[in-house]
Amino acid sequence: MHLLPEQATRHAVSIPELLVSRDERQARQHAWLTRHLTPLVSFTVVAPGPIKDSELTRRIFNHGVTALLAVAKKAGWSVREQAALASASGPEGFLAIEAPARDLKLATIELEHQHPLGRLWDIDVLTPEGDILSRRHFSLPARRCLLCEQSAAECARGKTHALSDLLIRMEALLHDADSSHIN
């Protein structure tokens, strides 16, 4: 289910392309839920800037896939189907997992907090009915910025940090994960 980093398009995506890609992801999510009738993990990489499909985002994505599969295996959950694809909005992963949706979301939240790359992953858990379980369902605060203690959404909206600084931080986190041999 991994994506080859060397095949990244490095295409600078436009806002209309990004919106179409997100609509297409929602349609894929709906199709998966209809097909499996089980919770769905929909997984992407937090990718600031216009280039969403890069060697960097694919390497971060591949770590996430490995970590998600390890979580499912450790919990004894069956993965009915898994797929990875590269879209205009970057790498996307889908895993239909036979597990209680709430437990699955708690496990992905823990993964986002414990793994060196967890802050760079956007892991959504959808119930079989199509409801997205969010951090708010568990009274958790909004995600923090990669570079400061502000809300990530506030910094992104205000373009508080230079794109180059964000990418350097992402590279450093990936280096740390690679160096510690953590999947």
UniProtKB/Swiss-Prot annotation:
Keyword Disulfide bond attributed: no
Record's keyword annotation contains Membrane: no
Superkingdom per UniProt: Bacteria
Biological process annotations from GO: prosthetic group biosynthetic process
Keywords carried by this UniProt record: Nucleotidyltransferase, Transferase
GO molecular function: holo-citrate lyase synthase activity
Record InterPro entries: CitX
EC number: 2.7.7.61
Reactions catalysed, as given in the entry: apo-[citrate lyase ACP] + 2'-(5''-triphospho-alpha-D-ribosyl)-3'-dephospho-CoA = holo-[citrate lyase ACP] + diphosphate
NCBIfam families noted in UniProt: citrate_citX (TIGR03124), PRK01392.1 (NF002383)
Similarity comment: Belongs to the CitX family.
Function of the protein: Transfers 2-(5''-triphosphoribosyl)-3'-dephosphocoenzyme-A on a serine residue to the apo-acyl carrier protein (gamma chain) of the citrate lyase to yield holo-acyl carrier protein.
Name of the protein in question: Apo-citrate lyase phosphoribosyl-dephospho-CoA transferase
Source organism phylogeny: Bacteria, Pseudomonadati, Pseudomonadota, Gammaproteobacteria, Enterobacterales
Gene: citX
